[in-house]
C-alpha cells in the first residue's frame, strides 16, 4: 500500500472568497471567468509537498511528512461537495470552510456546516479577508503570528473581536473551536486560521494545518492499493480537439491506465468503453483552465485525470468511473447502476421541469427546490429540448408550467415550441438566483389572480338614507340614499342595525 494525496474540499458562503483563496494558493485566476463570482464547476489542483513547503517556509519541513501533497477540489458550493461525497467515493477527506471575517456566518455557511456534520468530514475554518480590518498593514504571504504582531493595537483588537464572533457562531452550531495555535486536540476542537486570499497572509498556516491534520489523523485512510482497479468520480464531460468527448475525473483509489476497460455512469445505461489516452495537467495547473496537457500512461489516486475514450458523449458529471480489472464487466456495471440509483431525484405528479448540466448540479437544484417547497415533475441532465416544453405544458397548475434551466442552452427547435406554448422559461448559471426568479414569478402570478378574483367580488353596500328624501313610506318604499361603501345592486335584500341587532 502507498499513501495517496488527501483530497481537500473548499466550502463557504457566496463571495466569502473560496475561489480567491484557491487562486492565491495556486497562483491562477479562475474566479475572473466565473458566473456571479461563484465557482459553479468542479476542478482539481494538485499541490505537491515541495510547493507547500516553499510556501509555508519554516512551518512545513518535508522530512516530517509521508503524504505527497494536497489535492484541492474546487466545489461549486457545498451541494456538489455533499453529492460527490454521498456517491460511495468519500471524495473529500478534509474540508476548508471559508468565512468572511467581517460578515461572519451566513445562510450557506450554516448549510455547509450541516453537511460537514452529517458526513463527518474533518474541517478547519479559514477566517478570510483579515486585510480588510481597518488600519491593517499587510505583509504579503507571511504566516499569521508575525503579521498579527506587526499590527497596531487597534487593528489587533478589531480582528480579535471578529474572530471570536466566528468562534462563538461555531459554538452556537455545536462545534468547539479556537484559533488553531491554541487548539490542543484537533479531534475535539475546530482550528480557526485567520487568512487573506488577497495578500496571502495566513495561507502558510492553512497549508500547514491541512498537512498536519491529514498526516496525523488520516494517514491510514490514505493507504491505497496502487495497482488496484481505479475508482473515481466524473467532474466534467468535455469535447477536446483531436480527442472528441473526454471525461475529467478525480481518481481516489487504485489506478487507471491507457487500454483499460472502464464503466462510466451515463444518461441511460452505464457506458462501457476503452481508454484510448490519458491526459494530465502539469503540477500546479488546474484541470479546468489548463490547456497544456501531457499524455500519461496511467493516472493513480489521488489526481485529476482526463480520459479520452469512445462513446463518452452521454457520460454524466458526478457519476462514478470504475476500471474493470480483477472482476467481471457485469459486476462493475451493477456497482455503477447501484450508485446512480442512490441519486435519482424524487418527482411529483405535478410540478416544474428542471434541466441542469451535471448530475451534481441537478441534485443541487433538486435539494434547493425541495427546501423552497417547489415540486418537480421531471428532472434531467442536458439542454432544453421540445419534449421538455411539451412536458411542462402538461402541468396542472399554471405556476408549474415552467422550465428551470441551470447552466444549459435552449435548443433552437425548442425555441419555437416555447413561444407557442404557455410555458415560462427560467435560465441562470447561479442556482439561488434561478430559484429566486421563479419564486418572484409565482408571487406575481398569485397576486394577479387574487386581484382578478377581488375585482369580481361584489361587496355588500352600506347606505345612508338622506334626510328629506323619503318619497314613499312603503309598498314599495322609495328613498334617496348615499352609498357609503360597496356596490348597490337591484333585487338585493336590505336591512338595518339597531344596536347589535340586524
Give the ranges of each region predicted by the language model:
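Active-site phosphate-binding and catalytic loops of NTP-dependent enzymes
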Residues: 1, 29-36, 49-60, 81-83, ...
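Conserved catalytic network of the ASCE P-loop NTPase/AAA+ motor domain
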Residues: 2-3, 38-39, 61-66, 86-91, ...
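Conserved G1/Walker A P-loop phosphate-binding module
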Residues: 2-75, 94, 118, 134, ...
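Residue-level signature of catalytic and energy-coupling elements of molecular machines
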Residues: 14-15, 21, 38, 74, ...
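Conserved Switch II/interswitch segment of TRAFAC-class P-loop GTPases
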Residues: 47, 79-80, 90-110, 117-136, ...
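Switch II of P-loop NTPase G domains
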Residues: 54-115, 286-292, 328-344
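C-terminal effector/interaction modules appended to NTPase cores
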Residues: 66, 127, 143, 237-502
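Canonical P-loop GTPase G-domain recognition
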Residues: 131-224, 375-382, 388, 393, ...
